[in-house]
């Protein structure tokens, strides 16, 4: 019994008949195992008395655990479904913890009484710092020292300090879980009735959520570097917090507050006792099995009951007319949602840890090599890179990230661009490449046609996340999850240019700028439909269409964002991955980025249209040579492909297209509109001959 290895000691202490007699095993933390034959109807105190005679551990210090549940003294073994062959884990409480009936009144009569128990450089269980008061500036301490001390103690996880008192208040938990406090003046006291609620809420917001608010007084003298716990330890702590929160939700509105607090402290003591076991036990498959059983109990009993209660309230919400009751149900739904969000992070970490189980060839090789936790921490879930809502600093268990998205009745109050509904419309067409100064009206027609096409296709290809009749910048009401869509119209390689392109080229002249945009938009839509029909049928268009003089790929990207002017310029830009993909898909193509959300102005290489086209010509003049060189290089690359497609018809127009590339460059660059009009007459005469 004094050995550190595995030792089995058999003892028959059964007093009942053979039908109710079972054989159980008592396993201690030092791997000692005791086999007992007991009666299923035996009370738990009687079992503890028998275990005391075998192990020497007093019954007051014994904590028996069976299948993740702590055996209570007022229950029988049969209440915990203890069967033959089950193993009960024996955990001994700390010997310095005094029983509830023997609380001395002189435990803190001296200022250094807390160091008389031998807590030198280790975190002693049972002694916690509740409040550490730093003197204010009126006491002669500079504010810089206050900030330094606050920063140091804040990095340790201590809560904020009060500035109106002196001394360090120590809270010592007894076995009932209520605890007592004593300061350095030597006045132990029980919490007052008005302070009890504050202490319970303080535990709910700090200690019960895993923040390291418990630091021994001796450790303040020499701070030790924190040890990163493994995933099983973190899972146990995290599961304890979830257990407490589900208990709080289940007991909402109840009157048995003291029983709930006692149950909470009992479960906390169970977790702290489990965490004080050896590292070998924490990495064993048996420890993982206990975590799995505890998870099963929480999901079935507590999470299931929480879901059932919320579902019943939601089913009967139509019969509830009291605003206070509806507000309470709303608050309960929010808390339940946050709890299941935290439970989902726990299940992610549990799944990751379970996948690290390695049984090996022999039982001695079995190990759970989980390492530190990834998805969770003792204080709450770790925020991963992609979140439906922005990161809330300090958000952990019980913190509901609501309210920030409703500032100023819009979604622009400090939220990231990923929360705004955004639609990226990419239109790829073939036409003459012109400078931004001489092609403003063509961009306007193309943009209107793109909007009409996307409006018709929205029911099939995309789902909008805002109402069409609401404003973009400050839309009130409820928003849904934003959906980003990308619609790309890939051109046919042998597409011919219709008369609308010629009209667009002529429309840039000052004399013909007054023609209506709906007319050109309708022509462009009809031309696009006819081209798509001919491409699907595998036939060329009718001879009455004019061939494209200078074919080039022009990519227009329109960004429609619901954020309006509140978005930054970097948030409205097209992602670089999209631009790289388009450049790789269309090498040598010209990409124009337009942003209608910034009050009609365009971002990128396209500038805003003005009423006078002549005023834009001097601005576009420096870019003519660069555009001409670009178009010339582009034509050299696509001319062989165009020759193959057009040469199949045996038409002499192939010679005309390949004979005069320099003229096409001039037409595409927009340097001579009259020359383009004069040179367009030969194709018209040939078309009349063919007719």
From Swiss-Prot:
Record's comment on post-translational modification? Phosphorylated at the N-terminus by CCAMK.
Pfam families, per database record: ubiquitin
Question: Where does the protein end up?
Answer: Nucleus
Entry GO terms, CC: BAT3 complex; nucleus
Which terms does the record give in the GO molecular function aspect?
misfolded protein binding; polyubiquitin modification-dependent protein binding
One of its GO biological process terms is: nodulation
Q: Specify residue ranges for compositional bias: Polar residues.
A: 104-118, 178-189, 273-283, 446-465, 499-523, 536-554
**Which residue ranges have biased composition labelled Low complexity?**
597-617
- Keyword Cytoplasm appears in the UniProt entry: no
Enumerate the residue ranges of region (Disordered).
Answer: 92-118, 176-203, 264-283, 432-473, 499-554, 590-624, 645-691
Residue span(s) of domain Ubiquitin-like: 22-97
Q: What is its main location?
A: nucleus
**Basic and acidic residues compositional bias, start-end:** 525-535
Q: Which InterPro entries match?
A: Ubiquitin-like_dom, Ubiquitin-like_domsf, Ubiquitin_dom
Q: Where, by tissue, is this protein expressed?
A: Highly epressed in roots. Expressed at very low levels in leaves and stems.
**Which key words tag this protein in UniProt?**
Nodulation, Nucleus
CDD domains from the entry?
A: Ubl_ubiquitin_like
Cite the record's note on assembly: Interacts with CCAMK.
What is the role of the protein in this entry?
Involved in root nodulation. Required for root nodule organogenesis after infection by symbiotic rhizobia. Probably not involved in arbuscular mycorrhizal (AM) symbiosis. Acts downstream of CCAMK.
**Protein's name in the database:** Ubiquitin-like domain-containing protein CIP73
Instruction: Write down the species.
Output: Lotus japonicus
């Amino acid at each position: 019994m004094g050995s550190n290895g595995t030792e089995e000691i058999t003892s028959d202490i059964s007093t009942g008949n053979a039908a109710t007699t079972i054989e159980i095993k008592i396993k201690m933390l030092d791997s000692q195992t005791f086999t007992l034959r007991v009666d299923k109807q035996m009370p738990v105190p009687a079992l503890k008395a028998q275990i005391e005679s075998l192990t020497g551990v007093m019954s007051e210090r014994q904590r028996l655990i069976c299948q993740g549940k702590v055996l209570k003294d007022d229950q029988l073994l049969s209440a915990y479904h203890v069967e033959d062959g089950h193993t009960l884990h024996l955990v001994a409480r700390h010997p310095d913890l005094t029983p509830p009936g023997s609380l001395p009144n002189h435990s803190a009569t001296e200022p250094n009484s807390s160091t008389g128990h031998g807590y030198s450089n280790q975190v002693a269980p049972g002694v916690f710092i509740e409040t550490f008061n730093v003197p204010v500036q009126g006491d002669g301490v500079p504010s810089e020292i206050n900030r330094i001390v606050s920063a140091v103690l804040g990095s340790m996880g201590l809560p904020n300090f009060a500035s109106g008192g002196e001394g360090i208040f120590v809270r010592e938990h007894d076995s009932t879980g209520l605890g007592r406090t004593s300061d350095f003046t030597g006045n132990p006291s029980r919490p007052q009735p008005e302070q009890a609620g504050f202490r319970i809420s303080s535990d709910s917001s700090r200690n019960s959520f895993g923040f390291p608010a418990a630091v021994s007084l001796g450790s303040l003298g020499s701070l030790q570097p924190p040890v990163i716990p493994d995933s099983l330890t973190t899972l146990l702590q995290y599961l304890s917090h979830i257990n407490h929160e589900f208990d709080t939700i289940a007991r909402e509105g109840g009157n048995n507050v003291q029983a709930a607090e006692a149950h909470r402290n009992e479960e906390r003591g169970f977790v702290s006792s489990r965490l004080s076991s050896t590292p070998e036990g924490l990495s064993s498959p048996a420890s993982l099995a206990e975590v799995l059983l505890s998870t099963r109990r929480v999901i079935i009993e507590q999470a299931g009951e929480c879901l059932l209660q919320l579902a019943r309230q939601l089913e009967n919400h139509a019969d509830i007319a009291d605003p206070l009751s509806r507000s309470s149900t709303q608050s309960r739904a929010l808390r339940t949602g946050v709890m299941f969000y935290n439970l989902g992070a726990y299940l992610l970490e549990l799944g990751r840890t379970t996948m690290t189980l390695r049984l090996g060839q022999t039982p001695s090789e079995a190990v759970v090599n989980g390492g530190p936790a990834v998805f969770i921490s003792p204080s709450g879930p770790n925020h991963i890179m992609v979140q439906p809502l922005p990161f809330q600093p300090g958000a952990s268990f019980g913190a509901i990230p609501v309210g920030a998205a409703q500032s100023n009745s819009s979604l622009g109050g400090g939220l990231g661009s990923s929360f705004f509904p955004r639609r990226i419309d990419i239109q790829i067409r073939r036409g003459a490449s012109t400078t931004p100064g001489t092609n403003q009206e063509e961009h306007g027609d193309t943009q209107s046609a793109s909007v009409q096409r996307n409006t018709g296709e929205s029911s099939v290809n995309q789902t909008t996340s805002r109402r069409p009749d609401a404003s973009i910048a400050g839309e009130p009401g409820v928003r849904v999850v934003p959906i980003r869509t990308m619609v790309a119209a890939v051109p046919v390689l042998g597409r011919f240019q219709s008369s609308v392109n010629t009209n667009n080229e002529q429309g840039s002249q000052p004399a013909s700028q007054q023609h209506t945009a709906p007319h050109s938009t309708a022509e462009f839509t009809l031309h696009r439909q006819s081209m798509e029909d001919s491409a699907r049928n595998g036939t060329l268009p009718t001879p009455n269409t004019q061939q494209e003089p200078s074919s080039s790929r022009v990519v227009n990207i329109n960004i429609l964002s619901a954020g309006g002017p509140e978005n930054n310029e970097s948030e409205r830009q097209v992602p670089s991955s999209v631009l790289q993909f388009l450049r790789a898909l269309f090498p040598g193509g010209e990409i124009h980025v337009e942003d209608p959300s910034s009050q009609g102005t365009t971002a990128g290489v396209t500038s805003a249209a003005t009423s006078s086209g002549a005023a834009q010509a001097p601005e576009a003049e420096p870019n003519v040579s660069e555009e001409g060189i670009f178009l010339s290089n582009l034509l050299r690359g696509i001319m062989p492909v165009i020759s193959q497609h057009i040469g199949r018809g045996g038409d002499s127009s192939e010679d005309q297209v390949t004979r005069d590339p320099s003229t096409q460059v001039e037409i595409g660059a927009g340097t001579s509109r009259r020359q383009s009009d004069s040179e367009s007459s030969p194709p018209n005469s040939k078309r009349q001959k063919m007719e």
